[in-house]
Amino acid sequence: MKNPILILFTAFIALLGFFGMSAEALADPKADPLAGPNPDADPEAINLKAIAPLAKKLLG
């Protein structure tokens, strides 16, 4: 039999991840799961559209 503390810890982490993702989905229900971060929902999200031209300019 495996260590019961390890099993309980793994189950706790799995539930924490599940409920954390559910809370994020509830916070922004219109968000497309395949799209990037929504800047309106997350003001600290990285603006990739603004970074892409700069990266192209730097990398050539």
From Swiss-Prot:
Signal peptide start and end residues: 1-27
Entry keyword set: Amidation, Antibiotic, Antimicrobial, Fungicide, Immunity, Innate immunity, Repeat, Secreted, Signal
One cellular component term from this protein's GO annotations in UniProt: extracellular region
Cellular localisation: Secreted
Sequence positions bearing Leucine amide: 59
Job of this protein: The synthetic peptide shows antimicrobial activities against Gram-negative bacteria (but not against all strains tested), Gram-positive bacteria (not all strains tested) and the fungi C.albicans and C.parapsilosis. Exhibits little hemolytic activity against washed human erythrocytes.
Family: Belongs to the MCD family. Mastoparan subfamily.
Protein name, as recorded: Mastoparan-VT4
Tissue: Expressed by the venom gland.
Residue stretch(es) of the prosequence: 28-45
Any one of the GO BP annotations: killing of cells of another organism
AXPX repeat positions: 27-30, 31-34, 35-38, 41-44
